[in-house]
Design a protein with these regions (language model features):
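Conserved SAM-binding loop
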Residues: 8-9, 170
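Short, well-ordered alpha-helical microsegments
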Residues: 16-19
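Acceptor-substrate binding/catalytic loop of class I
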Residues: 9-14, 123-127
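Class I S-adenosyl-L-methionine
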Residues: 22-197
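Short glycine-dipeptide loop
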Residues: 1-7, 13, 143-144
Length: 197
């Protein structure tokens, strides 16, 4: 991975300590963990004696140092141009710093629900929402830069990269999922779609 770039790793609460340790040993600086509302509620495990898993854990880390890109993804609730604390910059129209918890209507969901999967005939146990990935990509990279996904599944990261004018490289071990990803990418490129949410 290039110096001064961001990385996002999707995980679970029980795997977080192991992944955190692996990332640090690989030379990443772990900045924090995003908790993003899923588009669905998980339904496996202890269904009567455990809380439903309705959040995706995403480890945010970097190699070197990189700041967030200025985007128009989310309007600031504070009035533009106001100075709320002495010595700090005046507020901007759009947020330049995002919360670590993405819940509610103003943020995209992390995954698609079963209705979306049925409508699109795309079934994957951990399919990610293209809009959510698009936000992460826009916050952390510039147009033309390379986005890599080592576990591309059905290609949501590729679609988000295409939609935000980034180069894309991915790997997938499962041939069936790889073929779905290829078909989704071809469909988007054929239609030259810029909004695939």
């Amino acid at each position: 991975m290039r110096e001064n770039s961001h990385a996002y790793f999707f995980t679970r609460f029980d795997c977080y300590p192991y992944h955190y340790d692996c990332l640090e040993r690989a030379g990443f600086t772990v900045k924090n963990c995003l908790i993003v509302e899923k588009g669905t509620i998980g339904g496996i495990g202890d269904l009567t004696g455990s809380y439903a898993n309705n959040a995706e854990w995403i480890i945010f880390c970097q190699k070197g140092r990189r700041t967030f890109q200025h985007t128009t993804l989310l309007e600031n609730r504070k009035k533009e141009g106001m100075q709320y604390h002495a010595g700090r910059e005046r507020s901007k129209k759009y947020k330049t710093r995002f919360n670590a918890c993405w819940f509610g209507e103003e943020y995209p969901k992390a995954t698609y629900n079963s209705v979306w999967q049925k409508q699109h005939q795309i079934y994957h146990p951990t399919i990610k929402n293209v809009e959510c990935l698009s936000w992460l990509i826009q916050i952390s990279s510039l147009q033309g830069e390379l986005v890599f996904d080592g576990f591309m599944g059905t290609g949501s990261t590729a679609l988000a990269a295409i939609q935000t004018q980034r180069a894309y490289l991915g790997a997938e071990i499962d041939k069936a999922y790889f073929e779905i990803a290829q078909n989704r990418i071809k469909e988007v490129e054929k239609r030259n779609v810029t909004n695939y949410f």
